[in-house]
Amino acid sequence: MKLTRSIGLVQAVAMVVGTIVGSSIFVQPSEVSRAVPSFGGMALVWMAAGALTWFGASICAELASAYPRTGGVYVFLREMFSPAAGFLWGWAMFWSMHSGIIAAIAMVFARYAATIVPMGDLGIRLTAVGGILGLSAINYVGVRPGSAVQTGLTITKIAAIGVLLVLLLGPGTLHAPVAAGAITAPGFFRGLVAGLFAFGGWHMVTYAAEETRDAERTIPRALMVGTAIVVVVYLLLNGAYLLVLPFDRVLASTHIAFDATAATAGPAAASAISVLVIVSSLGAISGIVLAGPRVYYAMAEDGLLFKWMGAVHPTFRTPHLAIVAQGIWSSVLVLTGTYGTIVSRVIYTEWIFFAALALGTVGLRRRSCNPQPNEERKDRKARKESQNALRSSRPLRSHVEYAPAFRAWGFPIAPALFALICFLMVINQIASTPRDALWGLGLVVAGLPVYAIWSRRRPVLDTREAAARSAGL
């Protein structure tokens, strides 16, 4: 049973924008201001975060055009390096990164809902779980209704942000920005990490490639257009915050969008910010709920997860059991309250994988420029790898010629710079909070022995069948 292609360019752009724009942009600017306490420093951090995100998106766009397969980043890592590299990404996704982020955003949604309908801690947690399970149910019954909800929520949130900008930048509301402190290198990187957290999720559209029409062209376009929209929106919002509020209030604020709206349009208008955050959070959850199970589906297809995780619903044509598993685990993280600890310790490790994607793209480009071996050498190499795969029972990579329909700009300087900044961020995180950072890294690396055990236990695939699966045939 195959997945169905129901996602077009509009839905794909909505997925990029909707997944990135969650609740962070209404909170993170204050975090950035405390790391770089000046107008110029904040502007520099947000421009750097936007540029870095855009470069990362362009790298993913190139890879998606070369490997338009369900699984996205998992497939890219598998093709570049090994199935083990892809497995580690999926392992970290399920246990912490994606499931934990779903739980964290769901709690933001529930806390803001509690400002409209008062409820206690248990009520907030149950509301968060209800949001997760409700959106999981919508995606369970089809990618078409799931992407329709995602598109509707994205259009609503962008329209609401447009209204917010009009309110904030109205006549008579502006203050001259004043610097409050010096910028340091560690502070800049702390601010960059906070800013990039608000840009997280740009890669998730690649996970549903086999449900996207003309995926090798649609996904790159969606990534470039969607990321550009978010960068512009974020720069405008941050500029508005800084021009509306005195800098000392920016530093002290914990709900900067609410405070800025209250200062310009009064408390009544500010209360509408809660509704905006609710809609924005639901849109982000919806995109992640749609995307994540496609990775687990791809891993199960490769024999690296339970076979049932790769099951496709006979009527709805969705990886329904993977959606259920993700929804249950995210709900457990909400109810136990462990999501915050896990996400804060593990989320930075995704930049190790993103750096690997950038460097891997350079390697793929260089190999594709080299003269091809003659047919006899290629056949001999393919036979040897097939024999090795049968001995080790590991899934084969497709080894298709690297011929992307889209190429990232600025090669090779941009990918190298992107990878360097990713590694600097990781080093800064380990130096700043060594115990937590190493704990998170350990959770990711713990997937290696699991992969070793799993790869021995999985059934041996016929080499032609495995190659066809890897190639998406």
Residue spans for each PLM region:
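A generic transmembrane alpha-helix motif of multi-pass inner-membrane proteins
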Residues: 349, 410-473
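Hydrophobic transmembrane alpha-helices that form the core helical bundles
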Residues: 31-34, 44, 53-132, 136-140, ...
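Membrane-interface loop-to-helix entry segments
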Residues: 123-171, 182-183, 223-224, 346-357, ...
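Membrane-interface "cap" regions at the ends of multi-pass membrane proteins
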Residues: 1-30, 34-39, 53-58, 70, ...
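TM-loop-TM module centered on a large, flexible mid-protein loop between adjacent transmembrane helices
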Residues: 75-76, 82, 114-119, 222-289, ...
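C-terminal membrane-solvent junction of multi-pass transporters and transport-like membrane proteins
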Residues: 149, 308-320, 354-370, 400-436, ...
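Helix-loop-helix connectors at the membrane interface of multi-pass transporters/channels
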Residues: 74-79, 106-127, 209-216, 221-229, ...
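Helix-loop-helix junctions that connect adjacent transmembrane segments
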Residues: 1-4, 39-43, 120-123, 151-275, ...
